Structures are given as structure tokens and as C-alpha cells.
């Protein structure tokens, strides 16, 4: 029996649709730019002057102009929406907080990812697998999702998140690493108090 090789399907790095369907999404302009950079051959096949001429050859001039105008209006509206969302994303930041649980044991809390359309549960599973540790999604004090990862892997997590954002064209987003000093001092104070109580006995 002849083995049938699975067909390789390219998905857009911006909207995640196959490139043939990008025009129906809200980020068509960015999708076209992504395709031109990543698959020049398919870009020419879909968007060269010949391809566009063939696609509209059966339409009347009036109908063609009407469709073009409606599509342009829709795309302008969607692009304005995308522009607002992009500005919001670029103004946001991701925080990786390193928290000391007890001596030599740490966890990191990653927050601020919810505005970037990133699947938090999927990312926590990726971290658990990649760093061979525990990871879960919880709600922080602001009632927003954050990823808690066991172990001091803040540098590795930062590198991975920066790469993830870069793939989405969000290179300018700041990924900030901080130490939770309050928790650390509180833990030290608790240990000191426990030691003092023990000495009195």
C-alpha cells in the first residue's frame, strides 16, 4: 500500500488563517506583509497584478468597483481597529516577578500577557514541559490571569516570551523582570520570629 504524505498547510503568522483566507480577517494589510516576507512565491500567486486581474476578470466594471470600494471601506475600518489594539499592546508590558518561597526555592509569576491574544493555559503547559517543572494559570490580586512557574527560570521565560512577541510583530513590548522584595523580607522576618520564639523556649 502506497503511503500518502500529509499535505503541508501554511498558516498566517498574524491571523493564523491559511493565507488564502486572510482577506476576510481584520488584519489583511499586516497579513500581506507577513506573507511577502515568509513565502514570496505564494504572495505572488495571490497578490500579483496578474492574479488580481484573473480574480476580477468575470466581473462587470461597476460591480468590480463596488466590491473594491466595500472591501476597502471594511478593511479601513478593521485596520483602524487593529491599529488601536496594536497601540494598546505596544503600551502594555509583561511582568515576570521572581518570588522567594523559602531558602533556595523560588517561583515566578508572569502577568500582562492577556492583552496579546496568547493562550495562557497552553503557554503554561509549554513552560511546564520546556522547563521540566510545575506551571499553572491563576488569578492575581487584580483578578487577572497570571502564570505561576515553579523554580527560578525567569531568564529562560523572558527569552521565550520575547521570541513569542517577536513572532507577533510586537518587538517593542517591554518584558520586565522584578524581584518581589516584600515577600522575601516577610519570609525572612517570619523565620527570624520563629527562631526567636524557639530560643525563648
From Swiss-Prot:
Family statement drawn from the similarity comment of this UniProt entry: Belongs to the DENR family.
Single Gene Ontology BP annotation: formation of translation preinitiation complex
Subunit and interaction comment: Interacts with the 40S ribosomal subunit.
Upper classification of the organism: Eukaryota, Fungi, Dikarya, Ascomycota, Saccharomycotina
InterPro entries associated with the record: DENR/SUI1_TIF, DENR_C, DENR_eukaryotes, DENR_N, SUI1, SUI1_dom_sf
Domain description: The SUI1 domain may be involved in RNA binding.
Keyword set, alphabetical order: Cytoplasm, Ribonucleoprotein, Ribosomal protein
GO CC terms, sorted: cytoplasm; ribonucleoprotein complex; ribosome
SUI1 domain location: 94-165
Protein name: Translation machinery-associated protein 22
One Gene Ontology molecular-function label: mRNA binding
Subcellular location, record wording: Cytoplasm
